[in-house]
A protein has these predicted regions:
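Canonical Radical SAM [4Fe-4S] cluster-binding loop centered on the CxxxCxxC motif
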Residues: 4-44, 286
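Residues that scaffold the ATP/ADP-binding catalytic core of kinase and kinase-like folds
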Residues: 23, 27, 72, 125, ...
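A short acidic, helix-capping loop that chelates divalent metal ions and anchors anionic groups
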Residues: 32-37, 123-131, 196-201, 295-297
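Conserved G/P- and acidic residue-centered "switch" motifs that form tight phosphate/ATP-binding loops
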Residues: 68
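Conserved, mostly hydrophobic/aromatic
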Residues: 16, 20, 24, 64, ...
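Auxiliary Fe-S-binding modules of radical SAM enzymes
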Residues: 1-11, 179-183, 193-196, 200-337
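Radical SAM/AdoMet-radical enzyme domain recognition
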Residues: 41-63, 71-191
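Glycine-centered loop/turn positions within well-structured domains
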Residues: 22, 124-125, 268, 294
C-alpha cells in the first residue's frame, strides 16, 4: 500500500485504549481526562477485523499503544489473533512497564515480538513526580519498570527503552538512563519532545545536546546501522526486524546495547514515514500533526463490507500529508540545543 508520494505504508500503530494507570506530566493535564465510554472505543474484535483488512493491503508491522495498552482487558487474545495473520512479521507494544513483568511470558507466547518501555528517570522520587504515581504504590514505581525490562529480555523479546528529555523534569537523568544499555542488550532511545498536548508546556532537549553529554561521560560514540542488539548478541533476526524506522543509533565503548535518537523536531524524517495510526475511537490518522483522518468505526458499525473498507483506506492513505510542522511550533521556544 502506497501513499500519494510513493511511500510504502506497512506499519500500523493501534491505540487500544485511552486509559492509563499513570499521569505523566507531559502527557496528561493536571485535572486528568474524562475517559471514553465503553461503547465509544473499538472492541477487540473490531480492531482485529481492521488489522486483517490492512494486512491484506500490505501492513507488516503492528504496534499496540494506549493510553497504557496493558490496562485493556483480554489484550493477549488480540495479540494472538494478529500473530495468526500470515503477512504480519512483527507485533510490538509500547508500555510504561509497570504492569508488564508478571505478564511477559503470556504476551510472548501469544506472539509479541518486541516491547518499547517508557522510562524517563531512575530516581524514585523524580519518577513519582513525573508519573503522578502514589508514593505508597510500590507496584507502580521505577523498580516495576526495571523488572519489566529484565522480564522482557528473559523472554527473548527485543527491548527498546524510550526516554523523553525535558529541562523541567529529567534533564539530569540522561546519563543514568543511557547506562541501562551498558550491561543489557537493549536500545535506549532519546526522543525529542513533540510540542503537542501537554508537551507544549515543557522544554525539550535536542538529540545533539544529549549525544554531546553522553560522549563526555562515556567516550566517543560510533554511528551504527539499524541492527537489533539481540541479533548482535547472536540471536537470529528476521530481516524485517532490521528496519529501525527514524532512529539513529550509536555504540559507546563497552556497551552491550545501543543508544538511539529520534529527532522529529531537529531532523524531520517525514520522507521515510511508513506508518498510519488507528485510534481507540476508530479513526485512521495519517499523521500525528493533523486531526483529519478516516472514521472507520462508523463504517464498521453501519454494516460496511471488507471491500468497501479496503477502498476507503486506500483512498485515505493516498492523501497522507507530505510532512508535519512540529518544527515550526518548536521554534517558539520548545527545544534547547
Amino acid at each position: 500500500m502506497q501513499d500519494g508520494l510513493g511511500r510504502e505504508i506497512d506499519y500500523l500503530r493501534i491505540s487500544v485504549t485511552d486509559k492509563c494507570n499513570l499521569r505523566c506530566r507531559y502527557c496528561m493535564p493536571p485535572q486528568g481526562i474524562t475517559p471514553l465510554a465503553h461503547e465509544e472505543i473499538l472492541t477487540l474484535e473490531e480492531i482485529f477485523r481492521l488489522v486483517g483488512i490492512m494486512e491484506q493491503l500490505g501492513i507488516r508491522k503492528v504496534r499496540l499503544t494506549g493510553g497504557e495498552p496493558m490496562v485493556r482487558k483480554n489484550l493477549p487474545w488480540l495479540v494472538e489473533q494478529i500473530h495468526g495473520l500470515p503477512g504480519i512479521r512483527e507485533i510490538a507494544m509500547t508500555t510504561n512497564g509497570t504492569l508488564f513483568a508478571p505478564q511477559a511470558e503470556v504476551y510472548r507466547k501469544a506472539g509479541l515480538t518486541a516491547v518499547n518501555i517508557s522510562l524517563d528517570t531512575l530516581d524514585p522520587e523524580r519518577f513519582r513526580c513525573i508519573t503522578g504515581c502514589d508514593r505508597a504504590d510500590r507496584a507502580a514505581g521505577v523498580d516495576s519498570v526495571l523488572r519489566a525490562i529484565d522480564a522482557a529480555l528473559e523472554q527473548q523479546l527485543r527491548v527498546k527503552i524510550n526516554c523523553v528529555p525535558c529541562v523541567e523534569m529529567n534533564g539530569e537523568d540522561m546519563e543514568g538512563i543511557a547506562a541501562l544499555a551498558a550491561d543489557r542488550p537493549v536500545d535506549v532511545r532519546f526522543i525529542e519532545l513533540m510540542p503537542i498536548g501537554c508537551g507544549k508546556d515543557y522544554t525539550g532537549i535536542s538529540s545533539k545536546e544529549i549525544l554531546s553529554r553522553l560522549e563526555r561521560r562515556f567516550g566517543a560514540a560510533i554511528a551504527v546501522p539499524g541492527k537489533s542488539p539481540l541479533a548482535v548478541a547472536g540471536r537470529a533476526a528476521d530481516p524485517y526486524e532490521e528496519t529501525d524506522g527514524p532512529a539513529e543509533y550509536y555504540q559507546f565503548p563497552g556497551f552491550s546495547g545501543r543508544i538511539g535518537f529520534i529527532s522529529p523536531i531537529s531532523h524531520k524524517f517525514c520522507r521515510e514515514c511508513n506508518r498510519v495510526r488507528l485510534t481507540c475511537e476508530g479513526r485512521l490518522k495519517l499523521c500525528l500533526h493533523y486531526d483529519r483522518g478516516l472514521e472507520l468505526k462508523t463504517l464498521l458499525r453501519s454494516g460496511a463490507l471488507d471491500e468497501e473498507i479496503r477502498e476507503r483506506i486506500l483512498a485515505a492513505v493516498r492523501e497522507k500529508p507530505s510532512e508535519h510542522h512540529f518544527r515550526e511550533k518548536a521554534a517558539d521556544g520548545g527545544l534547547t540545543d
